A protein has these predicted regions:
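Generic hydrophobic, helix-prone segments enriched in Leu/Val/Ile
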Residues: 16, 59-61, 96, 152-161, ...
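Bacterial N-terminal signal peptides that target proteins for export
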Residues: 1-9
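Bacterial N-terminal signal peptides
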Residues: 8-17
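Surface-exposed beta-loop interaction hotspot
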Residues: 123-170
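Acidic, serine/threonine-rich low-complexity disordered tracts
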Residues: 22-120, 166-256
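Residue-level recognition of conserved structural "scaffold" positions that shape functional pockets
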Residues: 21-23, 138, 155-156, 205
Length: 256
């Protein structure tokens, strides 16, 4: 948690002038090649070294016409949970509309509850600042290429159709716990081979990280926890492994 808080302070205090001059801004909404209709499922959550499950992810997706609603809830053995909902317009592109992010501690107490209105350019709700409730009513231009929660894997799955110089950039709303609008990039790192159930898999390797500008990025990337996706190519591509932090508190987790 201290690590993530230090990053937030660094971003706020040290980057203001640099970002305005040198930031690499995201482009238009990503082009959609792969997106399913109505699906649901559950996946065990493992610790960073594997072993016994420490929780479970529940996923629900419902599509009606050109609108899709995705809900992902991560429940942990200690009683804590992370919940993200996103509604987006999907036709030829992925255009975010609205959503909600909720983080609860092991006692079920809400630490973060944010509602995101992309067309209206508002983020409302509250977060806990070391036990003090802070109300949020943030007015910010949010373009349709603002993605969070379950929308991010949609970006990864459609990487090839949108990559420029092996990168795809977009904006996100990140609870730190205070909500911050960040530019993120998915970068292709090459291929990885793993063995699973006696089968050799050649997977595409991606990383997700914030980007502020070429001067600052090397410093930030050394500080932030690594978030990685291993994706099996196919029609559509499928997630073989996710490794990274569950939220701003930095607890590492693994999905396979």
């Amino acid at each position: 948690m201290r690590r993530m808080s230090a990053i937030a302070v660094f971003v706020t205090l040290a980057l203001g002038a640099i970002v305005s001059a040198d930031a690499r801004e995201p482009g238009d909404p990503i082009r959609i090649v792969w997106i399913e209709g109505d699906i649901a499922g559950q996946t065990p959550i493992l610790g960073p070294d594997g072993g016994a499950p420490i929780g479970i992810v529940e996923y629900h997706q419902h599509r009606k016409g050109d609108e899709v609603e995705m809900t992902r809830v991560s429940r942990f053995k200690d009683g804590s949970s992370d919940e993200d909902t996103a509604v987006a317009h999907v036709n030829r592109t992925l255009e975010a509309i609205r959503g909600r992010s909720i983080i609860r501690d092991k006692n079920g107490r809400t630490l973060v509850d944010l509602r995101i209105d992309v067309p209206g350019g508002r983020v409302t709700g509250f977060y806990s600042d070391n036990g003090t409730r802070r109300e949020v009513d943030m007015v910010e231009h949010l373009d349709p290429a603002t993605y969070w929660g379950p929308l991010i894997f949609t970006v990864v799955r459609n990487f090839e159709a949108n990559a420029e110089e092996d990168r795809v950039r977009f904006r996100t709303i990140a609870p730190t716990p205070r909500p911050r609008v960040l530019t993120m990039e998915v970068a292709h790192l090459g291929q990885r081979e793993i063995t699973r159930m006696g089968r050799e898999l050649t997977l595409e390797h991606y990383t997700l990280r914030p980007t502020f500008g070429w001067v600052v990025d090397p410093i930030v990337h050394r500080l932030v926890p690594t978030t990685e996706f291993l994706v099996e190519p196919g029609s559509p591509p499928s997630l073989a492994r996710y490794a990274g932090p569950r939220n701003y508190q930095g607890q590492e987790m693994l999905l396979e």
